[in-house]
From Swiss-Prot:
Pfam families: Helicase_C (PF00271), ResIII (PF04851), UVR (PF02151), UvrB (PF12344), UvrB_inter (PF17757). Residues 35-419 form the Helicase ATP-binding domain. The beta-hairpin motif is involved in DNA binding. Forms a heterotetramer with UvrA during the search for lesions. Interacts with UvrC in an incision complex. One of its GO terms (molecular function) is DNA binding. Keywords: ATP-binding, Cytoplasm, DNA damage, DNA excision, DNA repair, Excision nuclease, Nucleotide-binding, SOS response. SUPFAM superfamilies: C-terminal UvrC-binding domain of UvrB (SSF46600), P-loop containing nucleoside triphosphate hydrolases (SSF52540). Residues 657-692 form the UVR domain. ATP binds at residues 48-55. This is UvrABC system protein B. SMART domains: DEXDc, HELICc. It comes from Cutibacterium acnes (strain DSM 16379 / KPA171202) (Propionibacterium acnes). GO terms for cellular component: cytoplasm; excinuclease repair complex.
Length: 701
């Protein structure tokens, strides 16, 4: 349900900033997509071969359409990658990232067979939560917004109308009773903290109020003259540096699940009524244990809501709080978009089925909890959207995939093709070889690639075969690693980076070497047991796997098989069709395929560089431990917190140097605990402080 209140959104044009112009198939693909969307087609499919620059095509399409856009990705990694690339295209527009804010999530569950109740357990990522709030804030205040999301977009979120109603508009010259404003902030779940400025808090110093919104990296300073707002300024939360002077600002709630006192009162009455009805049903059926369990749990939750306005698992009462009818769809991110937004579904052959499958998986767990008295039936209305509810909420949709699924191809009036790569690279040559002696043949092919300094991907059907092959290749002196499902995301990224850097030569995997892997150094993809029909050897899986060799000038794919299956034939024919088109285009335009040079780098490298720079600074100016004023009796965390409370502009050079040392220690500690978002934020703070310090040193010379 979109907000009924008329919201004035800031209008600024999308403007692509890039040193490149559309090339290859991009110009005709962008023009055709624009024509189809503007003519009112609801479903448009872009069949984009691997490496043809689909992200850039989306950016130029957004610039032409000038409409808010939601891009849905199948996982967090691809969403982060896509958002980062779009940010380089749109430095002056809002490119937001909306994914689940859980680092770890164990849902509430009950296993009747063993009478085991598992309580909900989770670990929140504060930086990702800020980005979620930033997304909804941008959607409600401006039109030049692109949100990159996972299926989190279809999960329950607070009511947009209530979120807008609780928004606090502030304007210079406006009459405001200061204490009333503080009460409004507390009602909106902000916490007063006069010591340290953290997100979701505010502090008061005389006639000055400083608010640290959850959706901003910067803070807001409100200066009063009596009961009148004299000035509004956006400032850096650490240094206190003024970033901008504002005439008007909006302060949104500190949580998406905000509800006023009247709404909460109404919700509690509704929960009590449902509880009485449910208890009557359970007692009538002789389920006395379940009835007692439900009574104790729900009355405790109601008491918590009455006393503090919230309770553990309050999302299970969202239907009552939102005032929705039983069985109705929850509010979600889609409801925060204006009516004319454009949806882009990337890797649609994976993402569309994923959207359809979310509801049933969630519902089976909830039904068990309700049947055994752990939750009221209304808890089942705290859920993701059903697929038909999703389609009702979206308008025009562009599907992107190298292998579009049957759902999208049936709905679209033909596909738009993007096959020619800007680099002139062509699809890899596919060779089919018999399985007899396949390992010895594979070793010979690997050695040829290793001598050239290239990487190799090998995909097998089973975990056992992947492990055995890895051991066998290593015994024969080939540097090999094995990528499997038990390796966490960060380690997986590290392995791929090591392959690109040449620290090993062969990566063996099962179903992980497909969508989104960008490895220009790989010139050979070997597919073992290619003729074993099934999910891992379907035509779409094979085409996606073949695409991993499409970013190398010498790209080649070897399929080991004793017969050519229907899936293999489709994959080979489609690859050859694309290859013929690409080679004909290159010949006609005199294009010599250029190897793709993609920068190898990650967050750990940037953190290491920042740490090394601090060490050099400490050595040069002799700041840090052992110096006068260093207090060894407090922890690094306490010291860093003290540092943040200081106004940097008034700090002595030596104190500023010590603060940089402390923050660098904290950054390294965060990186060691794999808290990379925290470490990245600290890295940015440290860079700002070093700039300030170097200016101080220069001024004092």
């Amino acid at each position: 349900m979109r907000p009924v209140t008329d919201i004035t959104r800031r209008v600024a044009p999308f403007h692509v900033v890039s040193e490149f112009q559309p090339s290859g198939d991009q110009p005709q693909a962008i023009a055709e997509l624009e024509k189809r969307v503007n003519s009112g087609e609801q479903d448009v499919v872009l069949l984009g071969a691997t490496g043809t620059g689909k992200t850039a095509t989306v950016a130029w399409l957004a610039e032409r359409l000038q409409r808010p856009m939601l891009v849905m990705q199948p996982n967090k990694t691809l969403a982060a990658q896509f958002a980062q690339e779009l940010r380089t295209f749109f430095p002056d527009n809002a490119v937001e990232y909306f994914v689940s804010y859980y680092d770890y999530y164990q849902p509430e569950a009950y296993i009747p067979q063993t009478d085991t109740y598992i309580e909900k357990d989770s670990s929140l990522n504060e930086e990702v939560e800020r980005l979620r709030h930033s997304a909804t804030n941008s959607l409600l205040t401006r039109r030049d917004v692109i949100v990159v999301s996972t299926v989190s977009a279809i999960y329950g979120l607070g009511t947009p109308q209530e979120y807008v109603d609780r928004m606090i508009p502030l304007e210079v010259g406006q009459e405001w009773d200061r204490d009333e404003l503080l009460r409004d902030l507390v009602t909106n779940q902000y916490v007063r903290n006069d010591i340290s400025g953290e997100r979701g808090t505010f502090r008061v110093r005389g006639d000055t109020l400083e608010i640290f919104p959850v959706y901003e990296e910067n803070a807001l300073r409100v200066e009063f003259f009596g009961d009148e707002i004299e000035a509004l300024t956006t400032m850096h939360p650490l240094t206190g540096e003024i970033i901008s002077e504002d005439e008007q600002v909006y302060v949104f709630p500190a949580t998406h699940y905000v509800a006023g006192p009247e709404r909460m009162e109404r919700a509690i009455a509704s929960i009590q009524q449902e509880l009485e009805e449910r208890l009557a049903v359970l007692e009538r059926d002789g389920k006395l244990l379940e009835a007692q369990r439900l009574r104790m749990r729900t009355t405790y939750d109601i008491e918590m809501m009455q006393q503090v306005g919230a309770c553990a698992g309050i999302e299970n009462y969202s239907r009552h709080i939102d005032g929705r009818a039983p069985g109705s769809a929850p509010n979600c991110l889609l409801d925060y978009f204006p009516e004319d937004f454009v949806l882009v579904i990337d890797e649609s052959h994976v993402t569309v089925p994923q959207i359809g499958g979310m509801y049933e998986g969630d519902m089976s767990r909830k039904r068990t909890l309700v049947e055994h008295g752990f939750r009221l039936p209304s808890a089942m209305d705290n859920r993701p959207l059903k697929f038909d509810e999703f389609t009702q909420r979206i308008g025009q949709t562009v599907y992107l995939s190298a292998t579009p699924g049957s759902y999208e191809t049936e709905r679209a009036h033909g596909v738009v093709e993007q096959i020619i790569r800007p680099t002139g690279l062509v699809d890899p040559e596919i060779i089919v070889k018999p399985t007899r002696g396949q390992i010895d043949d594979l070793m010979g092919e690997i050695r040829t690639r290793v001598d050239r300094g290239d990487g190799v991907l090998v995909t097998t059907l089973t975990k056992k075969m992947a492990e055995d092959l890895t051991d066998y290749l290593m015994e024969h002196g080939i540097r090999t690693r094995y990528l499997h499902s038990e390796i966490d995301t960060l380690k997986r990224i590290e392995l791929l980076k090591e392959l690109r850097m040449g620290e090993f030569d062969v990566l063996v995997g099962i179903n992980l070497l497909r969508e989104g892997l960008d490895l220009p150094e790989v010139s050979l993809v070997a597919i073992l047991d290619a003729d074993k029909e099934g999910f891992l050897r379907s035509e779409r899986s094979l085409i996606q796997t073949v695409g991993r060799a499409a970013r190398n000038v010498n790209g080649q794919v070897i399929m080991y098989a004793d017969q050519i299956t229907d899936s293999m034939q489709v994959a080979i024919d489609e690859t050859n069709r694309r290859r013929d088109i690409q080679m004909a285009y290159n010949k006609e335009h005199g294009i010599d395929p250029q190897p793709l040079r993609k920068k190898i780098g990650d967050i750990t490298e940037m953190l290491a560089r920042e740490g090394a720079d601090t060490d050099e600074l400490v050595e040069k100016f002799n700041y840090g431990k052992g110096q006068r004023g260093y207090n060894s009796m407090i922890t690094d965390e306490q010291r860093a917190a003290q540092g943040r409370r200081l106004d940097v502009s008034k700090m002595a050079e030596e104190d500023l140097g010590k603060l940089i040392v402390d923050l660098t220690t904290e950054m390294r500690s965060a990186a060691g605990e794999l808290k990379f978002e925290v470490a990245a934020r600290l890295r940015d703070e440290i860079a700002d402080l070093k700039k300030e310090l170097r200016q101080m040193v220069e001024a004092n010379r």
